[in-house]
Amino acid sequence: AAMPLFIGYFQMKKQGQAIREEGPKWHNSKAGTPTMGGLVFLIGSILTGIWVGAWQKQLTPTLFILLFVLALYGVIGFLDDFIKIFKKRNMGLNSKQKLIGQILGGIIFYLVYRSEGYPGVLNFFGLDLPLGIIYGIFALFWLVGFSNAVNLTDGIDGLVAGLGSISFAAYGLIAWHQHQYDVLIICLSVLGGLLGFFVYNRKPAKIFMGDVGSLALGGLLAAISIMLNQEWTLLLIGLIYVMETASVMLQVTSFKLT
């Protein structure tokens, strides 16, 4: 219900997505399309998660850890989008500023994760590897890596909203199978938000999710895979994100070498 109002506000203010000159020609038609739609479904997902968690008596540390990751990475994306749109700086936050925010978020996540008694054991295709402090480095890499991977994938109408819906549905099933109902609540809350957003984001998109949505979704997926001790599954569930990131890295490397 809030999305049409959000779209209308951006159209009224004539604030929308800026398109880089070096981008594909077909991106030019998207110039001026409202963005930051991720803000709407993030707020909705957080409020729904808390409400359902309270209703089902599942306001656990795990639930709040996941909501923290969703909110913090969303704030980083929000600042990036805000600078792009309202400060008229097409690059938003620079890569160093974004990385510092993502790393700080990952460190806080890991410290809270360990303080709640989680063992720091990596599940590698069914084999449990007790990594100790090294697991902290892995967790940091996982959150930062996948938040950026989802962000890089967000370039085609409806793509991340559709892939995200599939990803959170998959982790919802895993959480249900493991009887981790607090994680299930978060998965379903975000899934509902993404399905509602997809109606407006499918081709031709009336609004984009922006970095506020994509960075938050990627960070949350990584955190969920860790909380479920199913880290390796993200390589399958998030295969498109991994492939897109690898493609971008190859293109950048090729460009620098030529």
Label each PLM-derived region with a short phrase.
Residues 57, 85-86, 117-128:
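Membrane-interface helix termini and inter-helical loops of multi-pass transporters
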Residues 31-42, 96-105, 161:
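Select subsegments of transmembrane alpha-helices in polytopic membrane proteins
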Residues 5-30, 79-93, 249-258:
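Cytosolic, membrane-interface loops and tails of multi-pass inner-membrane proteins
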Residues 19-33, 57-58, 62, 182-184:
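Alpha-helical transmembrane segments and immediately membrane-proximal extracytoplasmic
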Residues 31-33, 125-135:
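Short aromatic-rich membrane-water interface segments that cap or initiate transmembrane helices
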